[in-house]
A protein has these predicted regions:
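Active-site loop/oxyanion-hole signature of alpha/beta-hydrolase fold enzymes
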Residues: 33, 78-123, 294
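Conserved HGGG/HGGXW glycine-rich cap/lid loop of the alpha/beta-hydrolase fold
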Residues: 36, 41-86
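Flexible "cap/lid" loop of the alpha/beta hydrolase fold
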Residues: 133, 142-175
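Conserved alpha/beta-hydrolase catalytic His-Asp/Glu region
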Residues: 153-156, 177-239
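Acidic catalytic loop of the alpha/beta-hydrolase fold
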Residues: 228, 252-256, 282-283
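Short alpha-helix in the alpha/beta-hydrolase fold that links the catalytic acid
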Residues: 234-235, 243, 258-265
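Short beta-strand/loop motif that positions the catalytic acidic residue
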Residues: 241, 247-249
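Catalytic active-site module of serine/aspartate enzymes centered on a nucleophile-bearing elbow/loop
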Residues: 270-301
Length: 301
């Protein structure tokens, strides 16, 4: 699909009818001002929990991972982050983790969720922490899974950042999407699971075409471009975070260094608890959903 000229990531609705991709979870939509939307799927019953995915993903990542186990205890609302999946955001706006937290909060309010637990993975975990710093009195707690917490040069800056440039970015995206992306993106998706392997269920049922289309990669580039200033702001504010926070990290994560991010953040955030999952990689919510559920249950109100 070509890059959308004015909004990201692309189509405003999943395809319906016989041609619909069966891997795409049916969405509902919250309409926000300025032609923004938050797409979401809901399952389970109990206290409210909002699940936020990470980079190169859409809500199916959470849906295929910890959501089924969480739904036994919570009403889970899994969202497409702004500019990802089927959630629309204006081109060049709203990529900052703080802006994304605000947009998700707008959707939470419109849905009438009651003091939800905010659960995020990777980039989504950074959004969950920002959400807690912005709106501490509105949530029950934070579950931060494999969080990226501090500014650093990351692979996303190099691979995707240039595609978000206002001059030449769209052309570069089209060229790379047709040439290198078909080989590059599967390598990245598989590497996320190391040292484990991608589960067969994920391989068969995750909508890779949705998460890897050109417009979403442009959104990834915008996200990466705002990561340094946004995480600098976060790092300065972690000591003021006054929401019950559970940080979980994989002991063998090669995507986000657990010891430079989650471990340090847990020391800075008052009262935060840290759990290291031995031998687990970045995608441990898929291989160890029980630790995610345990952390969420500890915040249940």
């Amino acid at each position: 699909l070509p890059v959308a000229a004015h909004s990201l990531p692309g189509p405003a609705r999943p395809t319906s009818g016989e041609q619909a991709d069966p891997r795409i979870v049916p969405r509902r939509f919250v309409q926000l001002p300025d032609e923004r939307t938050i797409a979401y799927a809901q399952t389970g019953s109990g206290p409210d929990l909002v699940a936020i995915h990470g980079t190169l993903m859409c809500l199916e990542d959470q849906w295929l991972g910890p959501v089924p186990a969480l739904a036994e205890h919570f009403r889970v609302v899994a969202v497409d982050r702004p500019g990802h999946g089927f959630s629309l955001r204006p081109r060049g706006c709203g990529a900052d983790i703080w802006d994304q937290a605000t947009q998700i909060r707008e959707a939470v309010q419109k849905l009438g969720l009651n003091r939800p637990i905010i659960l995020g993975h990777s980039f989504g975990a950074a959004i969950a922490l920002a959400y807690g710093m912005l709106y501490p009195d509105e949530i029950a707690g934070i579950v931060s899974l494999a969080p990226v917490c501090f500014p650093e040069l990351r692979l996303e800056h190099l691979l995707f950042g240039p595609r978000a440039l206002p001059l030449g970015g769209d052309l570069l995206t089209r060229i790379l999407h047709a040439s290198s992306d078909p080989a590059l993106l599967p390598l990245l998706w598989n590497a996320m699971f190391l040292p484990q392997t991608m589960p067969q269920q994920f391989r068969q049922h995750f909508p890779f075409e949705l998460a890897g289309r050109a417009a979403q990669i442009t959104a990834e580039g915008e996200d990466a471009g705002w990561l340094w200033p946004a995480l600098t702001r976060s790092a300065l504010r972690y000591p003021s975070l006054r929401v019950p926070t559970r940080i979980l990290c994989g002991g063998a994560d090669i995507v986000v260094n657990s010891y430079l991010h989650g471990v340090v953040a847990a020391r800075l955030i008052p009262g935060a608890s840290l759990e290291m999952v031995p031998g687990a990689g970045h995608m441990f919510p898929h291989s160890h959903p029980e630790v995610v559920v345990r952390a969420a249950l500890s915040l249940k109100h």
